[in-house]
A protein has these predicted regions:
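Glycine-rich segments within core transmembrane alpha-helices of 12-TM secondary carriers
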Residues: 157-179, 394-405
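Juxtamembrane intracellular "pre-TM" segments in multi-pass secondary transporters
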Residues: 2-9, 218-258
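Multi-pass alpha-helical transporter architecture, strongest
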Residues: 9, 113, 205-216, 368, ...
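Helix-to-loop junctions at the C-terminal end of transmembrane segments
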Residues: 78-92, 312-326, 412
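C-terminal ends and interior cores of transmembrane alpha-helices
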Residues: 98-117, 335-349
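Hydrophobic core of transmembrane alpha-helices in multi-pass small-molecule transporters
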Residues: 107, 118-136, 352-367
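A membrane-interface helix-boundary motif in multi-pass transporters
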Residues: 58-61, 179-204, 410-429
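Short amphipathic helix-loop junctions that connect adjacent transmembrane helices
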Residues: 26-61, 272-297
Length: 447
């Protein structure tokens, strides 16, 4: 496959434009607000409390959200090794990228039917949409070392995240215009735009713009002749085992992945629970009606701050990596994350203070994601087996996300508040920082 082909790179980065609407609109901005309101209010808008009975146990509504998200990620961890091994064996990872894209986008549309009275059933589209999003990224990320030379991978990765931030922000603004200007009132039955229409738009946007990517990405990266179809399903786990054995012989890569496992716990937990934290831990005033309107609009504004600052942040840290190197730049981002957690735990109680945190999160969010992806890509050996290597990366990422999200939810459930859970995130970032620091040395590492 030709590297640094402009048309190919443009098509690859455009998938970020297509699928980034899911983490923004569904997991960060509109759906968490929608879920929190629906599960704490009746049909007439009266507050009914945050406690929900599920399987005979009383849970805080935000903790159920965390646990369900972790369950969806667990399915991804179990499923993608099988499919990625098959994709590498067949040399047709584009087909799997399309499958997960369609699964995720159609599931987003299914969230239109979310209903508190059938909570378990309503969570199924959320689970399958999460599987679709993260599953597609395994195959999407594995194209990076094939389409871009090592010296261009930071720039290409950052361009993808920047496109994703811009595109998803554009759709969020469209949804906000619909919600604020044409909002449908379920009591008076007036208006045009139901909040749930946003979920339909996410699915249409994702599946529609992804067609540009699918049109230009090659169908096959290499050819294999299948001689033993019976071993295809176990091949994925064997491939992961082989990748692990190779990584054990590469101390730098092993140390980077260990560090990534821990600091990514904190990053992903923040992405998942940020809106719910702000809704429950920030002082929005004493009038419940005014507070509800204020918090919803303010949180959406904070998400937009994160998005647009994130565009600049991804390019800022890409530039910094060219000046001081990827590892030192990642260390800078981790230090900023630690400051964010300490500041949030001890200081953030008002909307203004939360806006400051939103700015800082936006600054480092895109940078840490883009640099993590490109740094891992640079550490990889020359091989055709990129999908299995990125599947291993994905498994490490998801295991960290599962543990981070569950630990956040468990501490919140046991202590009765989400603020105490921030302490666990600080620990994750510090461990990641300590493990990564030896990578700044130029001499060969032993780990």
């Amino acid at each position: 496959m030709e590297k640094d082909n402009k048309q190919m790179i443009r098509a690859w980065t455009f998938y970020d434009w297509a699928n980034s609407v899911f983490p923004l609109v569904i997991t960060s901005a509109i759906f968490p607000n929608f879920y929190d309101f629906v599960t704490t209010h009746d049909a007439n808008g009266n507050f009914t409390g945050k406690s929900i009975q599920l399987l005979g146990i009383a849970f805080e509504n935000q903790n159920i959200y965390s646990f369900v998200y972790a369950f969806a990620l667990f399915i991804v961890v179990m499923l993608t090794p099988i499919l990625s091994g098959i994709a590498d064996y067949l040399g047709n990872k584009k087909m799997f990228l399309q499958f997960f894209c369609y699964l995720g986008s159609i599931s987003c549309m299914g969230l239109y039917f979310f209903n508190r009275d059938h909570l378990m059933l309503s969570f199924i589209p959320f689970i399958t949409a999460t599987i679709g999003f993260w599953g597609s990224l395994v195959y999407y990320n594995s194209y990076l070392p094939q389409i871009a030379s090592p010296e261009n991978q930071d720039k290409v990765s950052a361009r993808g995240f920047a496109l994703g931030y811009f595109g998803s922000s554009l759709l969020l603004i469209i949804c906000l215009i619909g919600i604020m200007v044409f909002k449908y009132d379920p009591i008076t039955h007036q208006g045009f735009f139901k909040v749930k229409y946003s979920f339909l738009l996410v699915g249409i946007w994702w599946i529609g713009f992804a067609q540009y990517t699918f049109n230009y990405l090659p169908k096959k990266s290499h050819d294999h002749k299948i001689t033993n179809k019976d071993g295809l399903f176990s091949k994925g786990f064997k491939e992961l085992s082989n990748v692990y054995e190779q990584i054990k012989l590469m101390p730098q890569l092993k140390r980077f992945l260990t560090s990534y496992f821990f600091y990514n716990m904190g990053v992903q937990a923040i992405m998942v629970v940020a809106v719910l934290f702000a809704r429950n831990e920030i002082d929005w005033g004493n009038d419940p009606v005014v507070a509800e309107k204020t918090k919803t609009s303010a949180l959406i504004v904070s998400i937009l701050i994160i998005q647009f600052v994130g565009i600049a942040g991804s390019f800022l840290f890409s530039w910094m990596s060219r000046q001081i190197g990827n590892v030192k730049t990642l260390i800078v981002t981790i230090l900023i994350w630690i400051f964010i957690c300490v500041f949030t735990y001890g200081v953030v109680h008002t909307p203004i203070e939360f806006y400051i945190v939103a700015f800082l999160v936006g600054l480092v969010m895109g940078g840490v994601q883009a640099l993590s992806r490109s740094t891992y890509s640079k550490y990889l050996p020359e091989t055709e087996d990129h999908t299995s290597f990125f599947s291993f990366y994905d498994v490490i990422e998801k295991l960290g996300m599962i543990l981070g999200t569950i630990s956040f939810g468990m501490i919140s459930q046991l202590t009765g508040g989400m603020r105490n859970s921030i302490l666990s995130l600080i620990v994750f970032f510090i461990i990641g920082l300590i493990v990564m620091f030896p990578l700044t040395r130029k001499k060969k590492l032993e780990f």
